[in-house]
Every structure is written in structure tokens, then in C-alpha cells.
Amino acid sequence: MFPNAAIAADKFHLIQELNRRVDKVRLRTMNQLKNYKLMDLKNADAASIEKAERMRKQYYLYKKFNWLLFTNDPAYTDPNREKKYNKVLQGYYNYNDILHYMCLYNPELEEAMNLKDRMIYFYKNSDLDNARKDINELISAFRDCKVPEISSFANTMTRWKTEIINSFIVTNEHGRKINSGIIENRNRTIKCIKHNSNGYTNWKRFRNRVLYVLNKDTTYHLYPKEGENENEQ
């Protein structure tokens, strides 16, 4: 229907898939530590008790602070953030310290996080002219990774390479990169309409409701549109 259309892979979905793989590394680490968490230490020697306690603290970090691996808010990982006492860790730590220890205890997780940061840097700093060169370097870095969950992501990037490069095309009208943000927003709005109504049995009524909600020129809004006086609604 549109032979000249450029198909683009939205960065949100690509990073989401990479985050899933990073989380698999975290879960694998937790499973390896679970035996120490459940160990009976009644008759154990001092060395075994010390090791088990250390492993339990590591398990606690990966279980409690898993969200730190995926946050995009630099305020959380600010090294100057106030440190607070943690009963389990028995010391004063901020989120930057905790993230540091999570990566320190598992070199594979650290490697996965470094590649995730490289992917985010790629999307922030590359452009259409350099995207092909940059993505080839990124694919090579992923392929050289020793972490199985992460190295296989190179195949995903290779398969969608053209679509990823197309996502750096900037539209002249708005000066924005091509993405599926508008479509995702419309789909979410329609799902909310269906959810709030507990479903529709009449197609025409459902269609009219969707068109009314998505139409910017509707005469009534729950919140006044920007630049309009409330009395004009």
C-alpha cells in the first residue's frame, strides 16, 4: 500500500527487550545464591557462616534493588545522594553504592549493564549519517560479550538493523525522529476506554466514543486545553 514507506524499529521496544535480558542475568545470579540463603547454619563452621551471610546480603541486593538496574533517573544514582543506614547490609549506603556493589559481585551483570549503557548512548548521540557505522560497532560489542543472555541480542540487532537505522530519520515537519509513540498513545487510550466501560457490545457506539475522545476539536474537555480560559469550555 505504501511502497516508499520507511519502516522503523521503535527504540522503546528494543531497550525493553534488552532490559529483559539484563534481568535474566540478575535472576540467574539470584538462583545461584538461593542455596546459601536457605542453608542451615546450626552446625556450620565460622568460615561457612561468614560466606553464607555474605551470599545472603548479595541475594538481598538483587531481590530488593532490582529496579536500580533499569532506572533512567540520574538523581537515584547520584554519588552525592544522602546515605542512609541499611539494617540488612549493616552500614550507610546510597543507591549509587548499592548499584556499584550489585555489579561488583557479578562481573557478568556489570558487563551487561555496560552494554545497556552503550545502547542508550547510541540512541542519544548517533544520527542518521553515523547510525550504520555506530550500530555495526555496537553489534560487534554485543557479539563479543561472554554473557549468553546478552550476546544473543546481537542477532536481534542484526535482524532489525535497517529498521533501527530508519528510526534516526528526522521528519521535516516536527524535527523529531520517527517513532511509534503516537500509535502507542492511541492504542493505550482505546484500551482505557474499553476498560472504563467494562466493554462495549455496540460497535457504532464504541466507534463514536473513540472518535470523540481522540478528536482534539471536541467541545468538552476534562481539563482545559492549553491557552484556553476555563470559562470558554
PLM feature spans:
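Acidic/histidine-rich catalytic cores and adjacent linkers
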Residues: 1-6, 12-15, 35-233
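Short alpha-helix plus adjacent loop in nuclease-associated cores
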Residues: 14-38
